[in-house]
Amino acid sequence: MDLAKHIEDSIEWGGLEVSKLNQDILNIHGITSNKVRCFLNNICSIGGTYLEIGVFRGATFCSAIYGNDVYAIGIDNFASPNLMPMGVSQKLAAYLKQRLDVPPQEDFLNNVKRFGNTEQIDVYKGDYTTFDYTQLPKLDIVFYDGDTRFHDQYVTLKKIIPQFSERTILIMDDWNWNSGAIDQIIEEEGLVVTHRREVYTNGEDMESYWNGLGIFVIES
């Protein structure tokens, strides 16, 4: 498959909010936008093994797996129950927290059971910076939605990359705040990047690709 074309098509259709997603999935609370959700649903339509770092309540995880034949893996410590967008006012934050009495871990598991095939899903609770990724199979699609700090991204990606398949799509969320970690790793490891697509936004934009995406096809 031409992964570069698949990425560009997924971005185009995601921008139009065209995917297999229904309104119930779009209603899952998450710090993201509908365009990102639709993009993930489209990108995962090719199947394979999908890893998501930082699943929170399952907005992007459920979007990625819904209607797709993927083996999906999620990792999160579920330690931030009141996670909110960086730039919201106190008034908007209070509004966003309405009807969020269910803790993130419980909410995530409920959403996964509702919208996914639990026989094709594994969820690990823990620190993604110290997780033993060698226990995982080779990864075809990776969505990093963890901390945007250089250290967290660098340490985590260094651990994940050895588990990449022959061709892996790496998606970095919050690309507006690119720390430079992936670029340093690409240089250090001599990684072969056959396609690179950067999507920038005005920042935390519900009508666009939220806070940007960095998308890479990395070949071994």
Residues of each region from the PLM?
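Class I SAM-dependent transferase core
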Residues: 12-31
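N-terminal pre-P-loop "Q-motif" helix
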Residues: 32-36
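N-terminal auxiliary segments of SAM/dcSAM-dependent transferases
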Residues: 1-2
